[in-house]
Amino acid sequence: MTASITEIDSISEESNVESVSHLQHSPSFEKKGADFSISLNEKKDFASPITEEIPSPDGIATPEPETKKKLSFGARVWDLICSPGRQHDVCVAAPTQLVRSCDDYANSASTLVTNDDGTKTKVDSDEKKHKHKNVRDYIRFKHVDIGGRIFDLITRLAGTSFTFILMLIILIVWAIVGGIYRAPDNWQIVMQDGSSIQCYVSDTLLMRQQQNQHIQVLTMISQLRSRLLTTSRLLGPVLNDKTKISSVNVALMKDDVGDAEKLPTENWFDFICNYVSFMVGSIIFLVVYWIGIFIWIGFGRMLGWSDEWQLYINTAVAVELTFTSVFLQNVRHRHMKYIDRCVTSIFRIDSVIEEELRRMMGDKEPNEEITIKMDKINLGERSIDYYADLIGSGVGVVVSTCVFVAWIAIGNVMHWDSNWWLIIGTYTGLVGFLDGFVLRNVYFRESSKEATEIQTLIDEDYALYQKLDLPLPHEHITNYKSTFGGSLSQWIGWLCALPISVLFSVFVILGLIIAAGSLRFNETAQLFCNTPTMIIEGALLIVLIEAHNIANLKRRIQFRQIHLRRLTILKMLAGDNYSTTSTV
């Protein structure tokens, strides 16, 4: 089932493309009367059929004609309840260059000139100017509803360097206050509650960030494959006609996206973050973390296994959770910026290649739409996706707000004592424990899907080079080498990502609640709930950072090599006229 959501206006070649709205449930996107369309086709349940979109003569996608029964009110309510977590196929056609434009422009000699206003100008033999605007960038998604856009804005802000530095300042101030007042219990409880609430919110933002970046990467891949099909179709005949190649006059693009293995550092903060990301996500850091836990257990008998003993580890882990959760958001944000920069450069190169090939061949056939089919999932994975979708949506925000309001409301009844302070930490700690496993499971499956689709794109790249009998360039420059620590971290990550691991976390939570209930949820019971869940959640975040580092490093290298292969094709087309002095 698909439904038209919004329209996109054409923009100039040097500006960013207007973002295409992305609605999580059954969205579809078209550009009316234009060359491209983006849609997310909904897969209901596990393998239900979807309504295909077929292009009409005027370029507007229209549903396949079929008789459709109107759902009853009860059926619509049930459909709404079941909608979170549904899988969607991604259908994208890259913006076609010079399709349906004037014949004089398409057949004239190539003089790619970019004016200040971003409009390309060509002059034919009659000195008559023709202007045309082409979409150079790739099409981006954004939510169509105002609530979704605000949520996405908050998610982006949470990943910025400003937010990360602000959190570091708060931790430093808290540590100074504790030193002045000699670390009283209330000081420790404040950190535990604050950390639990912050991690609870961060889990929501991390899930939202993960979902948005996943659909964005699949959209990038689909559009790259769409344009590659056109390039492959037109490039062979052009290369066979050497007389046409000499007419290409393009001085465009230099290799300026930076090293994929060592991210480009814009300032000292980026340099430090790259190093810290490597250290925090390493197997060494994870081993040190667990050594610290066992040392704490060793002091248990000396301290009489008291509440104070539990407070110590809870406070230490709370600091680690706050740091790693905010740091993970920042790492993802910075890594995605590099990929966006690299893919933007690839798209601009691709658009120039496509435009030149179409001019030479007089071709106006639109770029083909590429559909990425979502994998079939089982009942357990569907349940996990349902919960994850609720976390990363407005529903999760509403539930969180209600819980915090209820907690504040009972404060006066409980006389604002230590037990009241611990209640919110217990709730957010238990939920955060489950969220950690859910995040890992969803990330593992989404990352695997992205890796599969990127490899499909690479295989099609290789097929083009083989078809043209060209050597693959630059493959020796950057190749990911797995280490023992990296392999061990990946294995631990895989183990934590299993659906059975998520189910295990649910049983652990139920067991802790039953045990705490037998103690009437007193201070000792709540600390007992917090301690093991916080320890495991802290370890899961370390594993998640390492998993992201490994997967993102591979992805950056792959996009980087795609960029270099596109530059090779552009240089081959331009011949001696190619220059690397211009910027992207």
From Swiss-Prot:
Q: How does it sit in the membrane?
A: Multi-pass membrane protein
Q: Name one GO molecular function term.
A: iron ion transmembrane transporter activity
- The answer to whether the entry has keyword Iron is yes
The processes (GO biological process) annotated in the record are: zinc ion import across plasma membrane
Localization per Swiss-Prot or TrEMBL? Golgi apparatus membrane; Cell membrane
Q: Where is this region: Disordered?
A: 1-28
Q: Which domain of life is it from?
A: Eukaryota
Induction record: By zinc deficiency.
Q: Which InterPro entries match?
A: Iron_permease_Fet4
Q: Which UniProt keywords apply?
A: Cell membrane, Glycoprotein, Golgi apparatus, Ion transport, Iron, Iron transport, Membrane, Transmembrane, Transmembrane helix, Transport, Zinc, Zinc transport
UniProt xrefs under Pfam families:
Iron_permease
For side Cytoplasmic, which residue ranges?
182-277, 332-389, 440-493, 548-584
Query: What's the stated role of this polypeptide?
Result: Required for Fe(2+) ion low affinity uptake. Has a role in zinc uptake under conditions of zinc limitation.
Task: Supply the name of the protein.
Answer: Low-affinity iron/zinc ion transport protein fet4
Q: Which organism is it from?
A: Schizosaccharomyces pombe (strain 972 / ATCC 24843) (Fission yeast)
